[in-house]
Each structure stands twice: as structure tokens, then as C-alpha cells.
Amino acid sequence: MAKTLFVFTSFPRGYSRNCLQSFFKKKELGPKKIDDSSLNNHFSFITRKRLISKIRQQNLLETLALWINKYLSGGGHNKKNQSFDYCINYYFESIREVLTSVLQIVQLQPLLEEINELNSFQSIHSIFPSMEDHFSHRHHFSDIKIPYFIHPEILIRIFRRRIQDAPFSHLLRFVFYEYQNIIVLDKSIPLSWKEISKLSTFLWNYYVHEFESTLVSLWKRTFHFNSFPYGALLDRTQSIRKVKHIEKLPHFKKSPRIIILSGNIPLCVKKYSIHYVRYENNLMIALKGTKFLVHKWKCYIIRFWQYYFHCWFKPCRVSPRESSKECLTFLGYILGIRPQIIVVQAKMINNLPITSIISKELCAIIPVFHSIKLLAREKFCNTLGHPIGKLAWTTSEDDDIPNQFNHIWKNIFYYYSGCLNRNGLYQIQYILRFSCAKTLACKHKSTIRVVWKKYGSRRLFPRYSSYKERESPFLSRVYSHKKRFWYLDVIQVDFIADSLQKGRIPEFKTNFTNKKLIKQLPEQTQYDSVIL
């Protein structure tokens, strides 16, 4: 019996609230968080009435005349043009708020109805249990990057399919071409708070939703895929997985062929499955098949993007990789596959013969070398990994300095709780611990030994390796020590993971083989035994 399964796990940006907050109080090292909480609020007539009165206070003809005069005169930097800019920006800010309100009313309700099928979660760690269960049995991965910049005409064409009002489309075109920075979705680019608005968040959500919904519908119609969600009960320290709506398909006939891939590939009686995972603009597709089939999928995605969005999609944005040789970099982790040995005892009359089953396991490790590079860039250590004092924080109070270091380490430790190379994680703890002590010693012009005696090492920099704060009452402490843990209440990306994902360390994107990954992993000294 042939089965066709399609697992879809998605993290839409606005609804999962995955925008980052900085870990530091004095200096923000991460992007600012976009306040998109009003997307789910009810319609308010008072707010719309205030917007209408604000727009009526401005003279539209006078504002447009000033705007045209500015561009015809060349836009010199004088006081008169500055007053023009203030008047124009104030008017267009009100227009953007009106557009956001109208687009939310028209598009938000059908988007929320369809988003349940895409199965989004707030927890970032909820994606890794799904990848452990399904990605370890796939032969190839495809790492895809969605372009950050969206041409204004693409969004206008998308909205014209839903909104038939021509003046409203012209107003959209006028605003999008005037403020093109709204559609640049790279949060690392320095933009003002007015440009990073609710409208940009909504445009990003709708833009990605159009891509995903169209792609999924084509997959279903072409391959008769039956998608089922990968659910998780978000208990704080446990993940209980459920599978819904599994349907068995009859045997394939001999005649059907894949036409959309531009090749004659007969469908054999096999278990075909496609696993799709996305976080922000990074998405991965895992499938089982030959290299020829993987390259056909690459051509299919590129042509689909160019046909549907009418823009050039660079082939380098789709990088297929073989799971048995190469590793993946996703959300600050290095993901690879290694063989796992399971000891099985077959119960018989006289004795218990022991045999072993070799399976595949998806392993996640923390990139220690690249993480130390990021810490050196932020002046926590030098390039060799030796801790140094954070001189910029010496002006803070004595209690604030340890709290800032503890906050950094706590977020790093809980985010990378699923890694297997714990020695590298404790190396980062060593750097932050001594950097905190050297910062206090530099402030008081003393030595580290005096700081340890005055504050105490445990009180100054407590350890989080015992899982006391997040230990589950259903699991023993031995289990929490020896098994990797995915915390389903982690809803923000760590600073190190975000910097690696954004490509601030170019060496992190290079190919990393499974052989190098296995060398960094601890040996499998304890096997799982199963009695049959």
C-alpha cells in the first residue's frame, strides 16, 4: 500500500512574534522588536475616527504640491525643505495607518482561517522535535533563502487579485513607491521606527502566505498530498506529539507521470513525503530520492517563483545538500546525521540473544568556534577565547553588571539546551564568567581574587546546569542531565544564533561535513535496550 504524506511546519513572522529583543540594557546588540500586537485586536471606530480627523487637518493639495516642488527643486538641505519633509512625513504616516487598517480588515480573516492548516507555533524549539522525527530519514535537504526586498509592483499585483477597487490600488502604488524601505524585510538594516511599522509586518506576513498557500495547493493537486499537522502540547518541559488526518491512498497506476517537473519520472509504489520548515526567510525542504529528483525540485521552485511573483530568483538561493555527507545550518545550530546503535534483546525459551539495530539520528551541535568569534567582536574575549573585561559596562552599578552577564548566559544556555557538545557550551560560560569578574575588578581597580572573595563565585555567576528552574515534575533529574532538552517556552532567538543566521560570520555558511560533526560529539556509551 502506497502512502503519500506531507508534513508542513511553519512559523509566520507576525503571528509567532519571533522578532528579537536585545539582551543588553546599555547597548542593544540585536534588532528591535516590532510591536504587532494590534493585529489581533478588534476593530475600533474611535481609532479610525481619530485617523480621519488627523488627515482632514492636512490640506491634501497643498501637501502634494510641496512634495512635487521638493523633487523638482532637487531637494536641497535648507530649513524650508525640512519643514516640507516634516509636513509630508506626517501626512503619509496617517495614510499608512489607514492602509494598514483597511488591509487588515480585508485580508486578515481569511489569512487566519487558512493559517491553521500551516500549523504555526510560538515556540522556536518546537521545530526541532519534528526535524528529529522526520529529517533523519531523508536523503537530501534543500536550504532556500527568501529574498528580503520585495518590489512594490509585486505586492500591488497580489492585492489586485483580492481588491478590485482601482483608486485604492493607485493609492497603494503611490505609498509603496514613496516609502520603499517599508518593504525591506531585513531587520538588521538600520531603519527608523516610523518605517518599521505594522504595515511592514503585515506585508511580510501576506507576502509569505501567498507563496506558501500557492505552493501547497500545487503540491496537493499534482501529487495528491494529504497534509497533516505536527502538533505539540506546549507543556513547559515536555512535548507530546500527535498526528491527525492520516489517509491511505490506493496503489498508483502505471501511467501517471510528473509533468510539472519537466521530466518523465514515473511514480513507483513507495512512501513519498516532503517536509517543509520555515523560520522568517529561511526555509528547508527535506525529501527522499535521487540527485536528479532533487535538482528537478530546485528548478521547479525557481520557475514557480519567477512565474508567480514575476521576479528573478537567483539559483544560488536554493542549495541542495546530501544528508549523509553535508550538514545544515539552521537557527544557529549545525545539524547533521550520525548512526545510532540500539541494543535489542529477543526473548526466547533458553537465552536472550542480544542484537543491535543501526538507525540514523539527527544531531544538533553549537558552533563553538564561531560563537567565540562573536563574543570577541562584542569585546567579551579576544580572538583566542581569553576573557577580557567589558569596559563599556564599568559605569553601571555593581548589581547590574552580574545581572547583565547572567541574563546573557541564561538565554544562551536554554536556547542551546538541545546540543550534544556540552563542553563547548560550558566554554562559553567560562568566558562570560571571567569577563564578568574582570569587569568588576576593572571598575574597583582590584583583582579577580578580591572580587571572588567579596561576591562569591556562585552568587556572582550562578550555574544553570542543574535544571533546577525548569525541571519537570514528571521526569527524573538523571534523565534531564543525560538527555538533550528542547524547551517549548523559548519564543525568542538567541543573540548568537541570530547573528550566525544573518550571516555576520561568513565562515559559518561554509560546508560542514558529517565526519567533522561526529568528531565533536561524545561517544555513545549508553545504548537504549528494548526487549522483544
Swiss-Prot record:
InterPro entries hit by this protein: Domain_X (IPR024937), Maturase_MatK (IPR002866), Maturase_MatK_N (IPR024942)
Cellular component terms (Gene Ontology): chloroplast
Subcellular location: Plastid, Chloroplast
GO molecular function: RNA binding
Keywords of the record: Chloroplast, mRNA processing, Plastid, RNA-binding, tRNA processing
Keyword tRNA processing (UniProt): yes
A Pfam family of this chain: MatK_N
Domain of life: Eukaryota
Summary of the function given for this chain in its UniProt record: Usually encoded in the trnK tRNA gene intron. Probably assists in splicing its own and other chloroplast group II introns.
HAMAP family according to UniProt: MatK (MF_01390)
Protein name per its UniProtKB record: Maturase K
